[in-house]
Design a protein with these regions (language model features):
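Active-site nucleophile and cofactor-binding loops and adjacent substrate-binding regions
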Residues: 14-26, 139-145, 234-242
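Short glycine/serine/threonine-rich phosphate/pyrophosphate-binding segments
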Residues: 1, 22-29, 35, 145-152, ...
Length: 287
């Protein structure tokens, strides 16, 4: 919402962004661009040398009409994005360049608008919980690029609550994650005129559930997906919400939460990725 409002205000006619082949962010960007009559250019990096299969989010990107560039592993996607933007300008277009997740400033993004969206999400949830006479002790989410986690942290500070925001990393180490999240949170607070700043010490991230790496399915994640589906009828994905739920369950089993704590799990989407992992997921279910 906020990012595309900025793109419309800047009279952009093509949005350029990047992520992995099964990026939820890129798929949502393509959908929003289609709704607003803009073109979308997605720079999607392969994780390895496996064949590219049009399923999951990649299939939806095609259906949504995105122009897709598949990049080799290790490619600097930001540099490619700027090159593509220059090519679009030379053709008379007005490109809007936004990094993965939409919360790191740079390109066309002057403020961390993606994180602002999740600040608003925190305040919305806070109001809903208050109407039920509840206040969360913890809010648990998957974290990758960090914008969602940063936005929720600022939201908790803005609402002056004691809610602790817990990120379950789906990619990097906790140490590597905390400082960028704190930077995004501080930028978000500054952009909104909030007299507060954040350090790495204010960020809670657990990295024990990453497994072998980003997008690599493991048994605890598959178990969490199956349990939540069969107990609650809610679908989690293998990349983000499945790993985060596996982390939440393990933390609960280890006594991280008190028995009477109110714990909110934020489902960040990603369901289309299930179909990319179909056979692998079923093989874990059979074990």
């Amino acid at each position: 919402e906020y990012i595309f409002a900025d793109a419309v205000e800047k009279e952009a006619d093509v949005v350029i962004t990047w992520g992995g082949l099964q990026s939820n962010w890129c798929r949502q960007t393509a959908a929003a661009a289609a709704m607003l009559g803009m073109r979308s250019i997605l720079l999607l990096a392969k994780r390895d040398d496996s064949p590219v299969v049009a399923d999951g989010n990649l299939l939806l990107d095609e259906i949504l009409g995105a122009e897709i560039h598949v990049l080799e592993p290790g490619t600097n996607q930001g540099e490619v994005a700027e090159k593509v933007a220059e090519e679009e300008r030379a053709k008379g277009h007005t490109p809007y360049v936004v990094s993965v997740g939409g919360s790191r400033t740079g390109g066309s993004l002057e403020e961390p608008l993606g994180a602002m969206g999740y600040l608003a999400a925190f305040l919305e949830n806070h109001g809903q919980m208050a109407s039920l006479g509840l206040e969360p002790d913890y809010m648990v989410i998957p974290t990758g690029s960090g914008g969602t986690l940063a936005g929720l942290i600022v939201g908790a500070a803005a609402a002056e609550t004691d809610t602790k925001i817990v990120g379950i990393s789906v990619s990097g180490s906790a140490e590597a994650s905390k400082r960028p999240v704190a930077e995004i949170a501080t930028q978000t607070a500054e952009a909104l005129g909030l007299a507060t700043s954040f350090s790495a010490d204010d960020v809670i991230v657990f990295d024990e559930y990453v497994g072998e790496g980003y997008g690599i399915l493991n048994q605890p994640t598959a178990d969490a997906i199956r349990r939540v589906a069969r107990d609650e009828g809610i679908l989690l994905d293998p990349v983000y919400t499945g790993k985060a739920m596996a982390g939440l369950m393990d933390l609960a089993n280890k006594g991280y939460f008190e028995e009477d704590d109110v714990v909110v799990f934020i489902h960040t989407g990603g369901t289309p990725a299930i179909f990319h992992y179909g056979e692998e997921l079923l093989s874990y279910f059979r074990r």
